């Protein structure tokens, strides 16, 4: 009992809050991206069956990579794995944005997410005392749920005309103004880049 109480009184290390923010932005971008890609496929006039296949390909990446990603997360520096995971995500977003096969490149985003997940939890166990892991995991899961909701809401706004209008009003000095879904894809990439910065903070 004493150990539990002592652990409950411990403050989380500063690095945990950085990891928490990184998880928030990463999951936020993942969920927003799904909405943006669905809108993109609809506007391109792609076959309706491609929309459910997006999520299938994303999830399949977890299943296929499961035997390897855990061992990789244990054997490599966590921040390096998380950086590589988001580089893969950004590459996937780029491929979709320029019109390449959305199923293939969204699956690459899923691969990035599959790499990120065990590295995130591995890093958490290294920085958080054992007596605080339950609390830390609870905060991570709370951030994930909140970012899933926020990502869907943001994704819906990012594909709207009002978002482009807002960007033009806020940044009239830009040498170019984003059009169509380019602003939405760029916003997703920016969230991934923020996550990378937080990873190395």
Each predicted region: which residue ranges?
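Primarily residues marking transmembrane-helix entry/exit sites
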Residues: 12-20, 48, 99, 103
């Amino acid at each position: 009992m004493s150990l539990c109480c002592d652990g409950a009184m411990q403050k989380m290390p500063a690095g945990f809050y950085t990891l928490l923010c990184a998880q928030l932005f990463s999951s936020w971008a993942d969920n927003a991206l799904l909405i943006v890609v669905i809108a993109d496929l609809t506007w391109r006039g792609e076959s309706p069956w491609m929309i459910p296949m997006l999520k299938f390909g994303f999830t399949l990446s977890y299943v296929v990579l499961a035997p390897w990603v855990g061992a990789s997360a244990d054997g490599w520096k966590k921040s390096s794995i998380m950086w590589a995971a988001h580089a893969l995500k950004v590459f996937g977003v780029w491929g979709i944005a320029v019109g390449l096969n959305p199923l293939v490149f969204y699956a690459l985003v899923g691969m990035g997410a599959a790499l990120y997940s065990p590295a995130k939890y591995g890093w958490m166990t290294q920085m958080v005392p054992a007596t605080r892991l339950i609390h830390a995991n609870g905060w991570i899961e709370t951030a994930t749920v909140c970012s899933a909701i926020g990502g869907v809401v943001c994704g819906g706004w990012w594909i709207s005309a009002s978002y482009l209008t807002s960007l033009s009003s806020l940044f009239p000095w830009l040498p170019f103004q984003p059009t169509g879904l380019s602003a939405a894809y760029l916003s997703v990439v920016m969230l991934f880049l923020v996550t990378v910065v937080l990873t190395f903070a």
